[in-house]
Curated annotation (Swiss-Prot):
Family matches, as CDD domains: DLP_1
Region annotation Bundle signaling element (BSE): where it falls in the sequence: 307-332
Disulfide bonds: none
Protein name listed in UniProt: Interferon-induced GTP-binding protein Mx1
Length: 631
């Protein structure tokens, strides 16, 4: 008697709290965030899976042909003390149905399945929970999954087999799940779909238990094959196999009670010439299976708790950080709302100013806006330099035209100023569209950066975001137009060929000295060739002089355009653009009647925040439960 009492105390002190903890976490919805230790029951249709669960739970579950289990069924069994009354409860969605008699279970589950999956043969991944408290059940929680079917029949969806497999796989592939695979003893174990699926997700068989059913239907002479399976010689599983004999259809029709069925099962294995050894080894009968599963689940839970605690803490931190990204909740009263809006707009304006002043924070691998603009301006300067270095066919044509057609009394070497001026004007004018194109590229770049800040700061407030984005577009068009007008005006001014005398003289002198130095170098390298070329024809003198003057003016022109165009763009497209946005945002605050409208959150943002808050709430509760369990 003392040993029995000690065993009861062991269950009450160790086993039940472990299982209750996981059941509580599952009831809180923690399984939405991470996997919980569980035993999932799978089997092909007509494998005897329902009979095994009935034998363990002591209640009649839905039976019939075709798909009977159409939703995952969480079967929570709680052992009561002798003399306590049976009680049950079926829960799904927000519905709870209290049961006072085991005979009410089947109808309640059918109603739940019809409610969730619809009347018919469809399936759903939503859970139905069945709580059974009785002196005749073990402390155990199982998840019953739909039976595997290969072919759709009747009104079943054509892809019903694929749907069921996908549903089963979501459970059995989790490392936290022990897979209880139910297989009839009278079939070739290698052909069963359930065992094949279990092997696919658990190749080493580390977390799979096999349960053989219907041993009374094994053909005479085939008993040895069943024993080979039980001895792990055919399809090895590290957790091995159990074998049970549940009520058959005739037993049910004859209303054989579960107690009588257990007695009948005990006699069957005890008297069987082959299978009696399995009873002696504790591998046969439903009571042995129940004890084994309780031990497996309890051990599995205890091993999983440290990792589970880490996962809950990690999920809590992740959800907290994600919720923080959405910012503070919007205040309820108007005065505080206005203050909230002012703070949001002030923060946005600060971010815009940081961007303009090249003080913004950028992610790793990205670069600041001003760095991107500087690269554009450097490319512009390089473009001008390369452009002026190249001899335009038009320049050569103009000089030939002057030599051959229009040269008058000028002595060799004198430059026609009108020809010089004409060449300069056309060459400089050709750069105008390149400058305007750069303006448009930079404008797009700057607007993109401004809108990115806008989306980051106001992305959750659709009305405020759309209003500000529209205003930014207006400001962009105005600033771009003003900048373009000034750029085109600058190029019009560049049509006046002018340079300070002293500057021009110095530049021309430098160019001539460089070219003279080149000629000296050539003479040193090849004196004979230099002697022949030194007798300049009159055409060569004029062309050389013209080229030198063009180079001198190009240098000064390049300095002007290379500096002035980027300054114009920076002023209108960066500095003034940002300042106008800042003014515009402050003007939005003037209309206080729109404060609430501006702060209306997008529906998906509201839902996401609600979701994260619910998640944090259940994770907080889960942490409390774990802490209490550990004490």
């Amino acid at each position: 008697m003392d040993s029995v009492n000690n065993l009861c105390r062991h269950y009450e002190e160790k086993v039940r709290p472990c299982i209750d903890l996981i059941d509580t976490l599952r009831a809180l919805g923690v399984e939405q965030d991470l996997a919980l230790p569980a035993i999932a029951v799978i089997g092909d249709q007509s494998s005897g899976k329902s009979s095994v669960l009935e034998a363990l739970s002591g209640v009649a579950l839905p039976r019939g042909s075709g798909i009977v289990t159409r939703c995952p069924l969480v079967l929570k069994l709680r052992k009561l003390k002798e003399g306590e009354e049976w009680r049950g409860k079926v829960s799904y969605d927000d519905i709870e149905v209290e049961l006072s008699d085991p005979s009410e279970v089947e109808e309640a589950i059918n109603k739940g399945q019809n409610f969730i999956a619809g009347v018919g043969l469809g399936i759903s991944d939503k859970l139905i929970s069945l709580d059974v408290s009785s002196p005749n059940v073990p402390d155990l929680t199982l998840i019953d999954l739909p039976g595997i079917t290969r072919v759709a029949v009747g009104n079943q969806p054509a892809d019903i087999g694929r749907q069921i497999k996908r549903l089963i796989k979501t459970y059995i592939q989790k490392q936290e799940t022990i897979n209880l695979v139910v297989v009839p003893s009278n079939v070739d174990i290698a052909t069963t779909e359930a065992l094949s699926m279990a092997q696919e997700v658990d190749p080493e068989g580390d977390r799979t238990i096999g349960v053989l059913t219907k041993p009374d239907l094994v053909d005479r002479g085939a008993e040895g094959k069943v024993l080979d399976v039980m001895r792990n010689l055919v399809y090895p599983l590290k957790k091995g196999y159990m074998i049970v004999k549940c009520r058959g259809q005739q037993d049910i029709q004859e209303q054989l009670s579960l107690t009588e069925a257990f007695q009948k099962e005990q006699v069957f294995f005890k008297d069987h010439s082959y299978f009696s050894i399995l009873l002696e080894d504790g591998k046969a009968t439903v009571p042995c299976l129940a004890e084994r599963l309780t031990e497996e689940l309890t051990s599995h839970i205890c091993k999983s708790l440290p990792l589970l605690e880490d996962q809950i803490n990690s999920s809590h931190q992740s959800a907290s950080e994600e919720l923080q990204k959405y910012g503070a909740d919007i205040p309820e009263d108007d005065r505080t709302r206005m203050s909230f809006l002012v703070n949001k707009i002030s923060a946005f304006n600060r971010n815009i100013m940081n961007l303009i002043q090249a003080q913004e924070t950028v992610s790793e691998g990205d670069s600041r806006l001003f760095t991107k603009l500087r690269n554009e301006f450097l490319a512009w300067d390089d473009h001008i330099e390369e452009y002026f270095k190249k001899d335009s066919p038009e320049v050569q044509s103009k000089m030939k035209e002057f030599e051959n057609q229009y040269r008058g009394r000028e002595l060799p070497g004198f430059v026609d100023y009108k020809a010089f001026e004409s060449i300069i004007k056309k060459r400089v004018k050709a750069l105008e569209e390149s400058a305007v194109n750069m303006l448009r590229r930079v404008t797009k770049m700057v607007q993109t950066a401004f809108v990115k800040i806008l989306s980051n700061d106001f992305g959750d407030f659709l009305n405020l975001c759309c209003t500000a984005k529209s205003k930014i577009k207006e400001i962009r068009l105005n600033q771009e137009k003003e900048a373009e007008n000034l750029i085109r005006l600058h190029f019009q001014m560049e049509q006046i060929v002018y340079c300070q005398d002293q500057v021009y003289k110095e530049t021309l002198k430098t160019i001539r000295e460089k070219e003279a130095e080149k000629e000296k170098t050539k003479a040193l390298i090849n004196p004979a060739t230099f002697q022949n070329n030194s007798q300049f024809p009159q055409k060569g003198l004029t062309t050389t002089e013209m080229t030198q003057h063009l180079k001198a003016y190009y240098q000064e022109c390049r300095r002007n355009i290379g500096r002035q165009i980027p300054l114009i763009i920076q002023y209108f497209i960066l500095k003034t653009f940002g300042e106008e946005i800042e003014k515009m945002m402050l003007q939005l605050l003037q209309d206080t009647s729109k404060c609430s409208w501006f702060l209306e959150e997008q529906s998906d943002t509201r839902e996401k925040k609600k979701f994260l808050k619910r998640r944090l709430l259940r994770l907080d509760e889960a942490r409390q439960k774990l802490a209490k369990f550990s004490d």
